[in-house]
């Protein structure tokens, strides 16, 4: 099975360690839960950086693409 590989980009530090998720929906949920309260949300974005084939062990690169930005999930004042 082929699973997408994601990485969080911190604009001040760079890309973080990659993680494998089932699909974009799972990745977006995890990203939104972890980055909705963060300071400086404009610094963080979720990127798809490739795929992992669990049958062959191959990592398949792709042109990195932004899936979402933390600013999309910032909670308003309550």
For each feature predicted by the language model, list its residue ranges.
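Short aromatic-glycine-(Arg/Gly/Cys) micro-motifs in beta-strand/loop hairpins
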Residues: 1-15
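A short, exposed loop/beta-hairpin motif centered on an aromatic-Gly-Thr core
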Residues: 14-23
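Short, mixed-charge low-complexity intrinsically disordered segments
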Residues: 34-78
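Charged, amphipathic alpha-helical segments
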Residues: 23-33
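A generic alpha-helix propensity feature with a strong bias for hydrophobic helices
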Residues: 7, 21, 64-67
